[in-house]
Amino acid sequence: MLEDTWEEEIWEYKSKRKPKPVHPNNCSENISESVEKSTDGKHQSKGNEKRTSENPGKTKDHKVCLAETDSQISAGSSQSSSCRDESQQSQNKETTPKKQHRTRRGKQVTPKVRPVYDGYCPSCQMPFSSLLGQTPQWHVFECLDSPPISDTECPEGLLCTSTIPSHYKKYTHILLAQSRDSKEPLGSPSDALAGLFAAAAPGSPCNLEERRSMTLKTENLRKVSDHSLLMMQYLETSQPSAEINRKNVSSPCSQTSPVPQCAEFVKRDQLVGGGSPLAEVALNSQSKSGSMGLPLPENDTDSCEISYSPLHSDEETYDIDQELDDSQQELFFTQSSKDSSLEEDGSAIFENLHGPSPKEAEGIRPTAKSLVAQARCSAPSEGSTLSDSFLLLSYTSNRLSQEDLPHTDAAFHLLSPALAVGGAASNYQTSKAKLDEPEKFLSLASSHQQQKIETSAVGNQTSLPLLTRARSKPLEKEGGKCLPLHPTQSQTRGSPRKGLGAPGANCACRNAQKRSSMPLDKPLGTSPSSPKCSPSQPSKKVMKQMDIGVFFGLPPKRQETSLRESASEGPNVSPVVSPNQKRPRLCKRKAQSSLSDLEFDAKNLNESQHSVGLSGEKRQHRRKRHKTSNSPREGPCQRRSGHLMNNPELGPVSLSKAFVRRTRGRTQRGNMNISESSGAGEVRRTCPFYKRIPGTGFTVDAFQYGEIEGCTAYFLTHFHSDHYAGLSKDFTRPVYCSEITGNLLKKKLRVQEQYIRQLPMDTECVVDSVKVVLLDANHCPGATMILFQLPNGAVILHTGDFRADPSMERSRLAGRKVHTLFLDTTYCSPEYTFPSQQEVIQFAINTAFEAVTLNPRALVVCGTYCIGKEKVFLAIADVLGSKVGMSQEKYKTLQCLNIPEVSSLITTDMCDSLVHLLPMMQINFKGLQSHLKKCGGKYDQILAFRPTGWTHSNNITSTADIIPQTRGNISIYGIPYSEHSSYLEMKRFVQWLKPQKIIPTVNVGSFRSRNTMEKYFKEWRLEAGY
């Protein structure tokens, strides 16, 4: 425990004694860093009071000092404004400044408020604002004493804004630490910004808004729309009479002084929501550069690499929705441009009004105002507080209009589509005189509540061409000053556009109906004279299961259920989730370069796709494609280039992690935990541990996972599709297998011979310093068990698919001490007790011989897979003295075995054989009746065998229990001939081998199944006494 740590700060103890009155002249002008700061601004801790009283001499009016302190605290706490769990609780307890004075003069007990600290832990990078009952010094010492649990780097990297303490124990944040060490931390208050805050005059409009903002805090942020109206009033009072010269490369501080005042108001309102981290970066960087009067460096864009859509944790999203569920806001805006036609795609509705842009002739840049407004219209609602975004963008766009082009481009990268609704505010600075034209407003439903549909999560994504197209065309007019951008397909095919979002555009904002959402069934025409407001539909509210926040005194979380819309009505604006699923993280996308429409279609054919600048015919075609692909039960990340990639083996998919899709060398992130191979286009999954050989770089039967990192040799046990899945002629890594399996790979799959390593049976070979022996697995031709002997002496046996037999006890396994056994557990349950293979083969021989003896025109049919069951039909053919007739394809497959006994008994002449082979799926009455007709009347009876272990039952413990299914002249015997070990055979093999560790390789998908098999393994050990 540190000596300077106050006990009341640790225990959050507040004395009930009357605090000493603070003289108005004793207010400190600057609050020192790393000192406890309260977000509500109504009192300091006792430690701060003591430090304040020790600094007499610095005099200032008490009210001005209080307001300044509040603004500095707000700026200092911007590091943790992306998640305001603590701030919202403290804001609910806030009072106005007048009430504060009464509290200080009276004996009323001060409400207990949890302190919020600035800064980050230098060890784990956790923000100090997330501390509960700890001081920063206390946490740092504990963090240094207890190393992190995992060495896994945080998947969000530099964009991590989590405020959950356990998150920083579960993941490391090395990249974030390096970034904060090499430059000023993102969102930290700059001295220049603080100086601009302090420079505000007492009589400035910001001081008036200061009191208004304090009044708004008492409303617990329940009416977010009031902020928008308040911003209009502020802009009317603070806008300078003469317009700022936008041609200046570096503006003096005197020209930018009104902007930090607005920023002060924004910061004091405590920006909350998904866009807050990026908003603070833009605010700090712009205000700092403005105060220094220097242009931003051109490499800021490359160094920031900030994604357009920030991610939220579940806790962050809860707090955001808690505010937004109580908000009532709709934005009305219009946009003026020359010859600009935007395609309406369901996420927002535009109406373009033709208006003159007199400043365009003067060489003035269109800036990012219209671009930001377009980005908002194409972006999904991300749960951010729209009024805060509104205020921030009015400040940012004003700064953008004064800076050189690199400034505009750098700041544009910092803007999030979630904040882009504030683009409406950007035009207030130039269209003040036209704010009284309500008939020109176009309503845009914010739809920020998260809507729910029963089964699927639809996370809308923003069309990147919408942003880049709007940026690249106006910037090209500047003659080489813009950053290199690849022109989009919409630019190539569409007509040229002129200066979207010119400064003369009319824009305004007002409140509208409560909780409304726009119907998106048809596009809105671009009429310059008669703009219309689209009707809105109220959403229905449903109460869900009580959440944990209610236990801690928070209001119950309310969630919206949107009405089901048909495909013709277009997609939902808000992401929807299943009632039983977690909320999906919003997709984040890199803002590196523009994508053409065709590239984007290949990657993102979903409901939220937006396109711009297409011709009328193309637009109609695209619209039809959207309508045919819209389905309320499909998530956006499930579509791949016009078709669905549904794989039941994927299992539950985590939507809170990054989902990487690769198309033409580009990567885009979404909300699933799988990746797609850029070459084969197949879904790639992580190779499970039971297919990796520990201590080596070997994998066994793991071709469906693509190229596995760290794998030096791929082993294939046998040629069955569930084991060689993913192996094709394009595979270029070494494949180790038996000679028969290698032949099948060459002939059937066309795998290049140079990559096939055929190993002899029962012979010790060395592969990467590991001794390898292939043993007969008694499963199908070429099937092997693989015995590995590592350089350290460890012995590992992988059985692949095998049928245990007593003859294995006389193989090279005899006398071996096996440390780890990878066991085929297909039938690892006592109910699987079927006869041995020899008994079943003998039963089939006797039955077939009897039937043919009684009826010489009887035909024997055996069902087979690609390879396997050869012992059954070869034994029957040998007894009957006949060849086995089969299809041409099956004949070629069996010829690959290079077994003389097999080659001498097979033929493609069906009429010259008494035994026929058919696919296993055709062994039914309908298929056999059809096959009998094909024989041309040569046979009048069929005796069929379906050799599979899946037909067993508890009553079949011997061949005497086998009863055929008969219909007319067709009889089908389901014989329990399995090529996998029965439970008793498996038990005998394990008890003989006595491995130290058993790893099951089949039926391991559930914890219950794995736990059950572990119990069996323990019983076997106890019985065998090892």
UniProtKB/Swiss-Prot annotation:
Pfam family, one: DRMBL
UniProt entry keywords in alphabetical sequence: Cell cycle, Cell division, DNA damage, DNA repair, Hydrolase, Isopeptide bond, Metal-binding, Mitosis, Nucleus, Phosphoprotein, Ubl conjugation, Zinc, Zinc-finger
Cross-link (Glycyl lysine isopeptide (Lys-Gly) (interchain with G-Cter in SUMO2)): K359, K434, K522, K657
Enzyme class, first EC level, given as a word: hydrolase
Positions with biased composition (Basic and acidic residues): 34-65
Sites of Phosphoserine modification: S574, S578
GO MF entry, a single one: beta-lactamase activity
Region described as Disordered: 12-110, 474-542, 560-590, 602-651
Catalytic activities: a beta-lactam + H2O = a substituted beta-amino acid
Its EC number(s): 3.5.2.6
Superkingdom to which the source organism belongs: Eukaryota
Name of the featured protein: DNA cross-link repair 1A protein
Species this protein is from: Mus musculus
